[in-house]
Amino acid sequence: DPELAETMPQKLVAHTGMDAMTHAIEAYVSTANCDFTDPLALHAIKMIQRDLVGSYEGDMEKRDNMHNAQCLAGMAFSNALLGIVHSMAHKTGAAFADYGAHIIHGAANAMYLPKVIAFNAKDPVAKERYGEIADFMKLGGSTDDEKISLLIDYLRGMNDALNIPHCIKNYGADSYPTEEGFVPEDVFLERLPEIAANAILDACT
């Protein structure tokens, strides 16, 4: 029922929307993707590209569309599974709670997704799949490297439009971008090995 989403706070629209984009992209690039999940993932990506920012800005028709897109993305990943973006988001959420804030799941996905795409694209199969996503989004580029660069730029631009930081360093206690985030760099680096080990053990990895 899309009416349930009409009164969502703007920040929640942004975070859940980028969570859905991550669901769809990870499902499409998953090693368990198949003929049944690919169309769901790609159509969800296209709808999110078209409607998320408008939904964030208060367009209720686009909010309705996003409700459907998020369901499609969920259907895709429920059958194709997810990836390391979600694994890291799961393990960093409360990792710095003693510093007074939580890294919200959707914001974590949005921050990590461009970085994971850049890393995963070292694998030729993943690179081809990311290139196909960029083609479906009509981002341009004549080689997979160009397409992936454009995809990463697009996602970072979407984060900017949704007021989501690019990294933990700039993640404010209210989840908005700030020059100096609530997690000190030395604390982040100290806890990183444990976070990485926990992410490897996550069901999404």
Set out the residue ranges of the language-model regions.
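A glycine/threonine-rich phosphate-anchoring loop and its flanking beta-alpha core
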Residues: 1-33, 128-132
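Generic alpha-helical segment signature
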Residues: 14-18, 41, 126, 148, ...
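A short secondary-structure junction motif
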Residues: 24, 28, 51, 55, ...
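Active-site segments that bind and position negatively charged phosphate/pyrophosphate groups
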Residues: 27-154
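C-terminal charged capping/lid subdomain of soluble metabolic enzymes
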Residues: 134-205
